Amino acid sequence: MGKIRQGFIKRVARELFNKYPNEFTRDFEHNKKKVQELTNVTSKKIRNRIAGYITKLVRMKEEGKIL
């Protein structure tokens, strides 16, 4: 079983995804750079987790699972 993401990671990711919907793609590396530009997160681990969740949100939106 996988780990559950912490609430603040989901909250920040959703806020970024809703505020800048056209900035993110299915590419994790691209999203990682965008998270670095758009936030003041200094931790590499937290940045990567936020970017990973945003990548998941983009994929879910494209598949029609979220609006």
Swiss-Prot record:
An example molecular function term from Gene Ontology annotations: structural constituent of ribosome
UniProt xrefs under InterPro entries: Ribosomal_eS17, Ribosomal_eS17_CS, Ribosomal_eS17_sf
Gene Ontology terms describing biological process: translation
Keywords: Ribonucleoprotein, Ribosomal protein
Any one annotated GO CC term: ribosome
Leader peptide range in chain numbering: none
Domain of life per record: Archaea
Annotated family: Belongs to the eukaryotic ribosomal protein eS17 family.
UniProt name for this protein: Small ribosomal subunit protein eS17
UniProt source species: Pyrococcus horikoshii (strain ATCC 700860 / DSM 12428 / JCM 9974 / NBRC 100139 / OT-3)
